From Swiss-Prot:
InterPro entries: Chloromuconate_cycloisomerase (IPR013370), Enolase-like_C_sf (IPR036849), Enolase-like_N (IPR029017), Enolase_C-like (IPR029065), Mandel_Rmase/mucon_lact_enz_CS (IPR018110), Mandelate_racemase_C (IPR013342), Mandelate_racemase_N_dom (IPR013341). Its EC number is 5.5.1.1. This is Muconate cycloisomerase 1. SUPFAM superfamilies: Enolase C-terminal domain-like, Enolase N-terminal domain-like. The lineage of its organism: Bacteria, Pseudomonadati, Pseudomonadota, Gammaproteobacteria, Moraxellales. CDD domains: MLE. It comes from Acinetobacter baylyi (strain ATCC 33305 / BD413 / ADP1). The gene is catB. The active site is at K166. GO terms for molecular function: chloromuconate cycloisomerase activity; manganese ion binding; muconate cycloisomerase activity. It catalyses: (S)-muconolactone = cis,cis-muconate + H(+). GO terms for biological process: amino acid catabolic process; beta-ketoadipate pathway. Pathway: Aromatic compound metabolism; beta-ketoadipate pathway; 5-oxo-4,5-dihydro-2-furylacetate from catechol: step 2/3. SMART domains: MR_MLE. Keywords: Aromatic hydrocarbons catabolism, Isomerase, Manganese, Metal-binding.
Amino acid sequence: MYKSVETILVDIPTIRPHKLSVTTMQTQTLVLIKIITEDGIVGWGEATTIGGLNYGEESPESVKANIDTYFKPLLLSIKAPLNVAQTLKLIRKSINGNRFAKCAIQTALLEIQAKRLNVPVSELLGGRIRDRLPVLWTLASGDTDKDIAEAKKMIELKRHNTFKLKIGSNPLQHDVDHVIAIKKALGPEISVRVDVNRAWSELECVKGIQQLQDGGIDLIEQPCAIENTDALARLTARFDVAIMADEVLTGPDSAYRIAKKSGADVFAVKVEQSGGLIEACEVAKIARLAGISLYGGTMLEGPVGSIASAHAFSTFETLEFGTELFGPLLLTQSILKTPLQYENFELVVPNTPGLGIEVDEDKLEQLRRH
């Protein structure tokens, strides 16, 4: 079945410091998976995280170690022909947790199958509804004037016209004033959202969200702690502005629990956080049945993970709040022979077999961590 499984770490500087409540990034480490079948078909996947262990339970180094130690021997031991579902069932039975690693493996397996069938990965997920996805830009320099200038430049270039601000690392009032100043500078026609990255207590949320709602902000992402799902539900019921669940979503099980208690207005669906493209589509289905709006999230992946996400998001029946698949644009270097196509505020989803990308392996060799 499988001839080789390789895990590659690639450290690429960002175009500017990217400030979150949990860390400030100046370099992103891409975790790439390359699987080759015995008949020579290559599949790529990505398991990139944010800020090492600052954001979640898996780090680039732990993902590589676990794939090399556990996933790789398991895949190479498969002799009988198994389809993707059978292979994923075997992995689930043999390996607990490791959602990001499992997502990367699943992506590579789906790309192999899609190439074998000569179809895009989106076809294996039910077929796409859209060929283009709206993509916002995150303003995260932490400097109000710089963020305003950056936003205006993006609008002028027709690259982004919706913006998200990372807040939560400064005193609450400082962050609120920063956001509202940017919203006023950009005007009523431009959508501005915030991501608190779980930094506020429930009392702080009440104070901050009220001001942000009054200031014209139209989406508040994960304002309180992951563990406090009851607080998230109370905030959702209390405010008119949309409250979005992010870090609290770790796959279909958590999506069901949040939906059952009306715990959010919007779900930020992330393929890695969900455990795979298939699971991300299941999260989207739960949201739709519960009347919860959808947003395509990112782990600031490079082009492999971003376009894999795009294939999944292209199949969603609704995508009311667009996506944030800007990860490759945050990096100073590309690892593709042809970069992803961003134009007119959107990302074009390739219609060629597999993920529809070609990794530049010479460039990868130059950049990889040895």
